[in-house]
Amino acid sequence: MEDGAKDDYIKDIYRHASPNADTDSFLGSPTVAIDSTLSTSNSLSNLNLDTNDSSSSPPAHNDDVPDIAEVLQEMLATTELPSSTTDLDYEPELDLVGGHRRNLGQLNDYGSPRADSFVSLDPPSIGTEVEQFLSKKKQFFILSSAGKPIYTLHGSDDVILGYLGVLQTVVSAYQADESGDNLMSFRAGKTLVVVAVEGPLILAAVSKIGESESQLRAQLDVLYTQILSTLTKNQIHRIYANQSNFDLRNLLQGTDVYLDALTREIVNGSPSILLGALEPLILRKSIREEIDGVLLSCRTPSLLYGLIVSDSKLANVIRPKKHSLHPPDLILLFSMLFNTTSFRDGEHWVPICLPKFNSTGFLYAYIHFFSKSSALIQISADKNAFFELREAKQQILSQMEDKGLIKALERAEERGRFKPVDVAVPMVRHFLYKSRAHVQYVMPSYETHYYEPHMQRGLLTFYHQLHAQVNSDSSRGSNNGWRFMHLVRNSCIGFAWITPSFELYCVSGPNVSRATLAASIHSIAKWVSQHRERLFVIGGAVF
Amino acid sequence: MATPRTSSQERFAQFKLVLLGESFVGKSSLVTRFVKDEFLEQRESTIGAAFLTQTVSLEDNKTVRFEIWDTAGQERYKSLAPMYYRNANCAVVVYDITQASSLERSKAWVKELQHRAADGIIIGLAGNKLDLEDKREVPTEEARAYAEEAGLLFFETSALTGENVLELFTEIARKVPFENSTARPRMSAKGVDLNKNGGTEAQGCNC
């Protein structure tokens, strides 16, 4: 490891004073490149994994910490595992298994039945299940600060528990050194690990597909938001204050489907999560206003927000003057409604915390799908308001029916997104336009160039790269919020244009000149601006 | 009040029914079988509660419309339950015949209903998943004895095959006195208790 600096395994350990710092403040954070010479087995024993409670173990010496980080990310980065015949050549891995088991001993003391069943697997088998787990390009882990699993994207408990133990130990080692710092991220070759410590919860994202730290952090925030929406911040803090080794899965029972739906969206490259914005349903201005009118006229006293959503696209919203809705809350809500089957039948009354609105308390959502893909959502702070809102629903739907608005919505949904040709920029294959003021984005349909799912996935990966580059520290200059990025690949060219009012990402085929692209991008911005009232939900109706 | 139709002998009543029971015993599946005569192999957990209606016809020209609260079984929703059973005329408490512990949970629900729900509430005990006879943990006689002792209607049901599902709801419809029927839907909407927990609002956590 002498040449560690040139080596893929060189790690940048980012440490940060504020656990909630956003990417902007990352500019000033110290970056420490560590050249490690200690073997992984040493580093494990340095971490006191075999003590009874690693979270209260004496702070590890600073010099040792990077090595543990190295161990962890090596574990996560490794795709090739030793076969059983070469065990001796892979001593560090075996030692990790040892760490695994010691850590499980702790979990077991806390009485987790799952840990029990795991301990009987002695020694834990390093087989195809582990190989599969390690070969994943993307991982999410949510655990408690005591190291208890809460959610993972891949891997059974048998596979993940050891990794979670190491992760928890590394995070707590940083917390224990009295600097008040939290581990933020580290990198090994192409693998980036981003950690978010949210009170008693630890969330980690592992990516081998070139996403940026801020992108992964935004993804972790989406998952954290989902957990808060079920339990609220207060409840989580109260639970762990009483019992630090609580198994939160007991309380989250049944919500895995929503976390799964979100991680599926993230893994599929959801533009909504990338841009932190909602996609509106394209609707004639007059239709949108008529629906607003119906919603307003049927509003009952308990109503806080009223929304109509078609296939995850926001059609209408009414809200009190004092409160606006927060896109991250809605991204979450829409994912619950449209990526699961839970709400498709009947009427539902659901306690939900909308964390960006108020992370400490519950609101109540009346949810009803009035057609196959369109839902009416009425949100209230009053848990007894169901029948009041139900009656409002009956009036809303009968008025909409009478005025032909349900049909109009159906037609809008059938029409779907606009086509690239509508915008008259022949060289542009696809684009994402985010209005920063409305926190909404529009894009043309994928057809023509990206009709196959794998092509769409490729396009979205490319958008992530473009987004990462144009939003990277180095390209965030003074320019008053104006930025520009030109990214040339063999098969396509990407162009990003960031202004204080919008973000525009577009992709053309190869061999398109910069001048042509610049002209196209201007045309797109102009076209969107001309059609803004049809494309976006402008402010919603206010009462 | 019963709301007899004007025509000769036809009588119509509307009852509020709440389903309670541990998670994964099949409450939503029972309701779906009753309301839509469907069964979903892969069902996601209910969160909060779902509200459905279904009408059954009885002998003597009687028609009963059920307004059904299908509640979530998870522990975290426990404190919301009173909101759903408070005005209920009838309840179905569901357990899973393949999980002995789920019957114990049912007994706790029955006790809570008998203490805290409206007087005269008709309670049905449903041992669901009758199609999984080979995995049975709760003997029929044990459950029946308990039901008799506690004064409950008792059925073993299968939401999958539909066995006894309609029978369960029909028997409940027969047992609820027509006089106890809630009034017309519109009136019942206003009748929901808006005061008891007023002011809790966002603080009304469901821990």
Curated annotation (Swiss-Prot), chain A:
It comes from the Eukaryota. This is Vacuolar fusion protein MON1. In complex with YALI0F03861p/CCZ1, is required for multiple vacuole delivery pathways including the cytoplasm to vacuole transport (Cvt), autophagy, pexophagy and endocytosis. The MON1-CCZ1 complex acts at the fusion of vesicles with the vacuole, through its regulation of the SNARE complex during the coordinated priming and docking stages of fusion, and particularly at the stage of tethering/docking. Residues 41-57 have a biased composition (Low complexity). Residues 41-65 are annotated as: Disordered. It comes from Yarrowia lipolytica (strain CLIB 122 / E 150) (Yeast). It is found in: Endosome, Multivesicular body membrane; Prevacuolar compartment membrane; Vacuole membrane. Its main location: membrane. It is a peripheral membrane protein. Keywords: Autophagy, Endosome, Membrane, Protein transport, Transport, Vacuole. One of its GO terms (biological process) is vesicle-mediated transport. Belongs to the MON1/SAND family.
